């Protein structure tokens, strides 16, 4: 990197030469900015406030900010006044029942039990929980699908259908306890799932 003077054409005036021609303006500005080298005492004035502003003389002029009187009570401590109500969070409600690690989450109609809505997972957690529950059953294909993010939504729908078919086929479950995959033979549960 060369200096400015070597790159500038000979007819032009460089920044260094322009600064040398007019060293400082009368009001202390240089290139449109106030020049501050630590010497802020203006000429002709007798007393000036200190740079950091902690002098007692500056407080006597009335420019200093005074603390609030203690008569305001709770507002002086930074607490919210009782008249203002904070915004209420929207309660999350489920549209479809689902099972997550053995727990059944169903929609409660107009019940005051806010415990289930406060600790309930979000929709993504629902889908992941359904996929996780299906992979716990032992199907290898659904376990692979849980690893790929593109197929999470179709598997979640499949998991809902399989959960619903298992509930309907519960009394009719005379087949062995091995879980049936979507590609298995024609069983009542898989027939309902394909529909």
Swiss-Prot record:
Biased composition (Basic and acidic residues): 76-85
Post-translational modification: Phosphorylated. Phosphorylation at Ser-120 and Thr-178 is non-redundantly catalyzed by MAPK8 in vivo. Phosphorylation at Thr-148 is preferentially catalyzed by MAPK8 in vivo, but this modification can also be catalyzed by other kinases in the absence of MAPK8. May be phosphorylated by protein kinase C, which disrupts the interaction with calmodulin.
Modified residues (Phosphoserine): 22, 36, 41, 48, 71, 93, 101, 104, 119-120, 135, 151, 162, 165
Region (Effector domain involved in lipid-binding and calmodulin-binding): 87-110
InterPro entries documented for this protein: MARCKS
Keyword Ion transport: no
Membrane topology recorded in Swiss-Prot or TrEMBL: Lipid-anchor
Phosphothreonine found at: 14, 85, 148, 178, 187
Region annotated Disordered, chain positions: 1-195
Subunit details: Binds to filamentous actin (F-actin), but not to monomeric G-actin, independently of its phosphorylation status.
PANTHER family: MARCKS-RELATED PROTEIN, MYRISTOYLATED ALANINE-RICH C-KINASE SUBSTRATE MARCKS
Similarity-based family: Belongs to the MARCKS family.
Protein name as annotated: MARCKS-related protein
Organism name: Homo sapiens
